[in-house]
Each structure stands twice: as structure tokens, then as C-alpha cells.
Amino acid sequence: MKNRIILSVVLAALFFCSACSGPKTEVLVIGGSASGVAAGIQSARLGAKTIILEEHLWLGGMLTSAGVSAVDGNYRMPAGIFGEFRDSLVAHYGSLGALATGWVSNVLFEPSVGARIYKNMAAREPNLTVQYETKFISAEKTATGWKVVADHNGKQEVFEADILIDATELGDVAKACGVKYDIGIEDRNISGEAWAGDKNCDIIQDLTYAMILKDYGPEADMTIERPENYDPSLFYCSCKSQNCTDSVLKPWDFDMVMRYGKLPNNKYMINWPMQGNDYYTNIIEMDEKGREAELKKAKHRSLCYLYYMQHELGSKNLGLADDEYPTEDLLPFIPYHRESRRIQGVVRFNVNQILRPYDYTLYRTGIAVGDYPVDHHHQAYPNQEELKSLTFGPVPSYNVPMGVLLPKEVTDLIVAEKSVSVSNIVNGCTRLQPVVTQLGQAAGILAALAVKENRELREVTVREVQKVLLENGGYLMPYIDLPKDHPHFKALQRIGVCGILKGEGRSINWANETWFRKDEPVGVSELSQGLADLYPTFKMEASGEYLSVEETENLLVALGVFLEKEGITAEHIRKAWGDLGLRDYKPNRPVSREEFAVLFDHFLTPFDMIRVDINGMPV
């Protein structure tokens, strides 16, 4: 009897220890969101053993699981893994033009197609494991990293990891790890932004339970059961209607509204802000039960809108697509969250740094680019008076600094998706799919470099991360002068983040741009300032307004001597001219900015030679 008791105790202990030990990995990504899948893929590609935990059945987050399958921005900047994803869409649908089915975007697709693409991309990485239907519960810091508890189909599992990446939709992991964060509108006196509010409050952007509808044919009647408490007046001004009496709103006709998110294969993404299915609620700090109750209301709003389209507008042939989501209600797995917690990071990116990037130094640390405007959805908020102090204006395209990924006080943790360290205002443009995908890719690089070289996250330098990004199709600066496969693209990117020559940002309606101005001559005054920032004791000698080809040669030779770099002679420079793909060598003509960047990058390698810290200051 005594032996049986001892045996039972031993077996119980062994079982308990087995349950506690769980899978071990180098990088653990929590959330298979747009940023999470990119982080996991990139980390694995760099040789780090990586696991992604995803609560639902699909990877891709807002691009797939939330049904926002119309890409916002970055059409001319298909960076990194986002670019790979877009290329896969092109391969599936036949051409880039085949993706331009609606007017809200040039890239629209069926969410299920996007989910299959991401699943296939992840499956190709031998160092990556994806575990679906796994919900995060808690995280505990250990001496060597993190211990994470998650629920997998009703069973608790424990994961151990060196580095943790929070790629959840609402920053739940960051909170569990003790990261300080902000929620909602900021006082302009605190954020330093003229566009911000006049006080701090927890008002966030509206969320949306998007719908993917399908045209079932002219004879079909897909009308759903009338939702409880249905009120058609809520939707009168969603499109032109005799019932719309609002003198301020100028709604489009229904056909225009439907073509907004038209997808391939006679499907429609319904994500309509103008008295459509945007819904205001702030569930960020709620428990699971509270969140479920609020999201049920958001679903109800969308279904009421669907019933309005079917019953009031005569579109009975449109119904929820039965070949998209494997959910009981045919709605997406998750809503489209436009705003989440925003961590207090080692840097805080605000709109001033977008409007006037060269007044600051953070642009030198760029790891993602975007061209979408500052777009806040607040139409569904019930008390519009509280929002009157917010103002929004045009912005150029921009890059996002690396420091937004790193919490100020917690180590061995990277935060991605929409919970990065940006202001409330800036979240309106960094929240979009291409940007968060790039942020995730950078997070994966940062994590992998740290674990593979046994370093702390903050010991990984900005330039190391940027170098890997460039090697993997990424952008550091939002220049659109050259496509990323052009042989001079990387040189312009490297010279750009060094600040030797500066780009010009423009805001043209919603098509925000930044140009390196590659064909323009090099201004002596601008160049002198750019060199002084990096080589403060070097004295540049040049005459006239613009630098000539011969003066460029002389400058490179002089800087080579100053920096004690051997092998930089006028003869070498002339020989390299053709080898580097440059043409029309004439010593007395003005050198173009592209030519100068290519030569300077090749001979003096400032990107490699001059490191910058997380704030963009030379070290």
C-alpha cells in the first residue's frame, strides 16, 4: 500500500512537471496578426527557432481574420514580406491590375485567399511552428527569458522563450508583462502636437465588424432574419436616400458605396464608416466576458446594416459569403481594431516627426515606411462635442523609427502591431496593414539577431536591423524614385538614413509621397550641412551652387584621406563610374543626386561606418 502511494505521488509529480515544462523556443510570437506572421517568418528565416501562437484558425490578422482585405497605402512601396504577400496575390489572381477591383484600394482580395497565402508562407519555414486555437493567458519573466501560459483547445500549455513578441490586436501581452502604456486621446500639451486634443481621455477609434458579402445572382433572396431592435434610420445617410436629411453629409449613391470594397469573384468587403457598420466601443481594458458582450453589439450593428441593404435598398441577392469564414455566423473571426494600447517605448513617435522629419534625428532609425494619411474613425462616437479639439491635416509619407518596438522598462520583449510607441494622432497612419507588417518583420529581425548572437535586444544596433531589412526587400526611407529591385535603390536608402542628402515630402490628396529627387543636381549648401552632421571636423571645399562630377571626385578623395580609407583615387572613381551603372561621364557637368549617392555609398560606406543609437544620434 505504501509503495502504491509513493508511486502515485511520483507519477503525479512527473505529470505536473511535464505539463509545466512545455515547448521551448528562442522566439515566441503571440498573435498571428499582420505583424505577427511577418515577425515569425522573418525570425525563422534568420535561423531562430520560432513559434507563433494564434487564437483563431487563420494567420494575417486584420488582412484576413478581420476581413479588411483592401490594402491601405504603400502601393508604390511594396516592402519586404508585405511585398511578398502582394506578389503572391498577383500570382493567384493573374496580374496586379486584377487586384484593383474596388476604388478604396489598388490591392483587394478575398480574405480566404490571403489566409492560404500566409499559411503557405509559414509552412515553408523549417524553423517556424504555428499553433492555432491557442489563447494567451499569462506571461512571467524568468532569468533566461519568459514563461508563457496559453490555452489550447481547453488545455493549458506552458511555453518558454528567450524573446517574446507581442503581436496581439490590443497589446494584451504588453500589459501582462508590466509595460506602461497609454490609451486614447492625448493632451496636446503632453504630446507636443498641435493636432492633439485639449485633454487626456480614453476615447479610441471606432472598430468595425467587417462583412464579406457575395452576389448570389439576380434571382436569389439572401435576406437575413430581421435583427432584434433593428432601426433603419441609423443607416439613412449611408448612401443617397430620400430619408437622408443631414445637410452636412453628402453621401454617395449605393452603387458607389458597394464599389468601395468590391473584391474579386463578385464579393464585397463591407467596412463603411459613413453611417454604416463602424461601431464605437472601448473594450481594451475589459475582461473576456465584457469584450464578448461588446463585440456581440458590434456584430449586431453590422447585421442590421446588412438587413438595411437587403430590405430597404433592394439588394436581396447579396448575402454573407458562405465560402470565406468557417464561422457559425459567417462573420470574420475578429473585428477590425483601429486602436489599441500604445506602449511607452524607448522613443515616442509623434506627428511633428512626420511633418518635419529633418528637424529631428529619428528618421535615421527607420525600419518601416508608410504613405497613408492620418485617418481617424470617430463617426460612431456618440458625443461628437468631445472630439472637437482634434484636428487633422495633410502629411507626407514617412518612416517609423525602430525604438517604437521596444518598451522603456521591460527587457526581452518586443511590441508590434498597433501597440507600438506612437502618439494617438500618429496611430491614425501607422495602424494600416502594410506598416504593421513591416513593423512585424523588423521585430522578427531584432529578435533573431539577439538570440542567435546571445545579446540583449538593446545591444542589437539600428544599422544591423536596417541592413537585414534591405537584404530582405525592405524600405528604410519612403523614397519612390526607384523601385526596390533597381541596382541603385539600396544606395539611395542608405544615404537617405545617413542624412547626407535629404528627401522631399509631399502631400497630394491621399497620395502622400517622398522623393529623393534623384535626377536633380547636388546642392553644395545642403551637402555641406549633411556632411557636417556626420563629419563635424571635415571642411568641404566646393564652389558654386551645385557640385560637379569632378568636384565629387575631389570630395571623395579628400574624405578618403580624412577617414584614412585607402584606395580612393580619381582614377578608381572614374573606373567605377561605369561599373556602378552610371553613364555620361563629363567632369564639368553637375553630378546628379543619384550619381552622388551611389558613389558616396560605394567608396565611403557611411551606413556601415557611422553607427547611430536608438535616437538616431551618431555613436
What are these regions (language model features)?
Residues 140-158:
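Conserved beta-strand-loop-beta-strand element in the redox core of flavoprotein oxidoreductases
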Residues 497-619:
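Terminal recognition/anchoring or ligand-binding modules at protein termini
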Residues 23-33:
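Beta1/beta-strand and adjacent pyrophosphate-binding region of the FAD-binding site
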Residues 42, 48-49, 54-138, 142, ...:
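Conserved N-terminal/central alpha/beta ligand/cofactor-binding core
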Residues 36:
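N-terminal Rossmann-fold NAD(P) dinucleotide-binding loop
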Residues 14-24:
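Bacterial Sec-dependent signal peptides at the C-terminal "C-region" and cleavage site
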Residues 20, 152-163, 167-469, 599, ...:
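Flavin (FAD/FMN)-binding glycine-rich loop and adjacent Rossmann-like elements that form
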Residues 5-15:
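Sec-dependent N-terminal signal peptides
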